[in-house]
Amino acid sequence: MTVCVVYITVTHGAKTNDFCARFCSTWNQHPPKADCDLIVACQGGPLPTETALLFASLKPRFWPRINDGGRDLSAYIEAARTIAKGYDMILALGESVHFAREGWLKRLVEARQRHGPGMYGIWGTHVIRAHLLTTAFFITPSLLASYPLPVTDKNSRYELEHGERALWRRLQSRNMPVKLVTWDSEWSPGRWRVPKNCLWRGDQSGVLMKCNHTERYEAADPVRKRNWEASSNRPFR
């Protein structure tokens, strides 16, 4: 199976250097344990040399592009239609993503081998509507490339992630597997809030990766944590 990791960076972003340094250091500390190529999507043009050098140990391919209103999601769709279309799977990762345990890609590959082409998420919630967060997801390129709506602004980004006709719902309607993947299992829609220590529950140790969403929960006081968990655990719809 050929896998491409598409990692988002924002050229000259306020936090980009810090995010990229953490991404690379935690990748090296906690390796994927599965073969992959890394494509760094440079939103807004080529990265400054000092930022690009942070990736030296990972030997990526840099992909400069316009930082349009679709932000990360339009980049992933374009990658699926162009630079990454020849891979079996794409792992789409937002800029704040980082790692705390080795084998994160191996787990996703295992799930893909078990269930087949489809969409595999890292974090699931029922806030607004049930959805897999698009801060990180693992998907067959042709399925992402076939998303029929333009993604050009905040509203269209949210529609893809958690709208009434979200990407995952479109795939499910075609009988494609849509799974939340944790360290010990894969979970179908309706069961994304079942795992212990998932997103916004317990110590979140069941998640394969960390990001800005997991960090905010970690930093919250006990009352806010309870409120976030209760909101995320609302009935599936």
List where the protein language model places each region.
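ER/Golgi luminal nucleotide-sugar-dependent glycosyltransferases, focusing on the catalytic module
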Residues: 1-237
